[in-house]
From Swiss-Prot:
Name of this protein: Beta-carotene 3-hydroxylase, chloroplastic
Histidine box-4, short sequence motif: residues: 276-280
Domain of life: Eukaryota
Transit peptide, from-to: 1-78
Keywords linked to the UniProt accession: Carotenoid biosynthesis, Chloroplast, Hydrolase, Iron, Membrane, Metal-binding, NAD, Oxidoreductase, Plastid, Transit peptide, Transmembrane, Transmembrane helix
GO-annotated biological processes: carotene metabolic process; xanthophyll biosynthetic process
An MF annotation (GO) of this entry: hydrolase activity
Reaction(s) catalysed by this chain's protein: all-trans-beta-carotene + 4 reduced [2Fe-2S]-[ferredoxin] + 2 O2 + 4 H(+) = all-trans-zeaxanthin + 4 oxidized [2Fe-2S]-[ferredoxin] + 2 H2O
Motif (Histidine box-1): 177-182
GO-annotated cellular components: chloroplast membrane
Lineage of origin: Eukaryota, Viridiplantae, Streptophyta, Embryophyta, Tracheophyta
Segments carrying motif Histidine box-2: 189-193
Subcellular locations according to the entry: Plastid, Chloroplast membrane
């Protein structure tokens, strides 16, 4: 029986042929067995392998090295470009910061000058109006008592109407603020709701408008005797007192147009200032329109919680 195997590899072939004894032969006899020595060559010789490896690895290593070098050079070029770009961005940012700082310094200097100008105007007007009011009250009653009679009814009417006029001005200002200033006179009042440029604004003309009837009432009451002139004198005095209080609380405390000193430490005035700040925020459709009774207006529309939050915010800002 003859069996033949053929195994083919990548680089070699294996041939094996076996001649065995026939199964019919019972007696032992020597018969030539012809076997061919199998040849197994799985890999090529070591020298060839090492030679092929060397020839293959050298170009590959060289190519990798060249690619890495090119890649490194590219990264260096990109990094250099990034450094140049970062330097330009840094210079541009420094210029912007310097320009912003210069603008801020100019703005602070302008604000300081405006506050000083308004402070001088407020002090002079307050001192002048207060001194004139005190002197006019003194001389008016001293002249009336020259005959030895004390006009009690006239004096009582004067002081009563002074208080009444001051309180009434709050309600007048509240109505006028909503019905006139935020309506037909908005073109003048609008300057008060925009950032102010300069120490004064167009809205300040309303102070002059309110001063005209006060001066007229004071003049008539000062130069005439009797109950009616005394009442007119008191009304003018009340309007004047309200105007001075309005200037210190509204212009000084709320809008910080000049320092007000210990007025800022009065708890109720802090509530008034916070309430008027909410008027400028339009959170309650402009409410409150009044000044000294502003917290009461907010209570009527359910804004007490927001008012307390605004008071706390202003307190933190003042402390910082």
């Amino acid at each position: 029986m003859e069996t033949q195997f053929l195994v083919s590899g990548r680089n070699s072939n294996i041939h094996c042929r076996i001649d065995s004894i026939s199964s019919s032969s019972l007696t032992p006899k020597s018969s030539p067995v012809s076997t061919s020595t199998p040849t197994l060559v799985v890999f090529p010789p070591f020298k060839l392998v090492s030679k092929s490896l060397r020839t293959r690895s050298k170009p590959r290593l060289t190519v990798c090295f060249v690619l890495e070098e090119k890649e490194l050079r590219g990264k260096l070029v990109v990094a250099s470009d990034d450094d140049d770009g970062a330097g330009e961005v840094r210079k541009q940012r420094e210029k912007e910061i310097s320009a912003s700082a210069e603008k801020l310094a100019q703005k602070l200097a302008r604000k300081k000058s405006e506050r000083f100008t308004y402070l001088v105007a407020a002090v002079m007007s307050s001192f002048g109006i207060t001194s004139m009011a005190v002197l006019s009250v003194y001389y008016r009653f001293s002249w009336q008592m020259e005959g030895g009679e004390i006009p009690l009814s006239e004096m009582f009417g004067t002081f009563a109407l002074s208080v009444g006029a001051a309180v009434g001005m709050e309600f007048w200002a509240r109505w006028a603020h909503e019905a006139l200033w935020h309506a037909s006179l908005w073109h003048m009042h609008e300057s008060h709701h925009k950032p102010r440029e300069g120490p004064f604004e167009l809205n300040d003309i309303f102070a002059i408008i309110n001063a005209v009837p006060a001066i007229a009432l004071l003049s008539y009451g000062f130069f005439h005797k009797g109950l009616i002139p005394g009442l007119c004198f008191g009304a003018g005095l009340g309007i004047t007192v309200f105007g001075m209080a309005y200037m210190f609380v509204h212009d000084g405390l709320v809008h910080k147009r000049f320092p007000v000193g210990p007025i800022a430490d009065v708890p109720y005035f802090r509530r008034v200032a916070a309430a008027h700040t909410l008027h400028h925020s339009d959170k309650f459709n402009g409410v409150p329109y009044g000044l000294f009774l502003g917290p009461k207006e907010l209570e009527e529309v359910g804004g007490l919680q927001v008012l307390e939050m605004e008071i706390n915010r202003r307190t933190k800002n003042n402390q910082s």
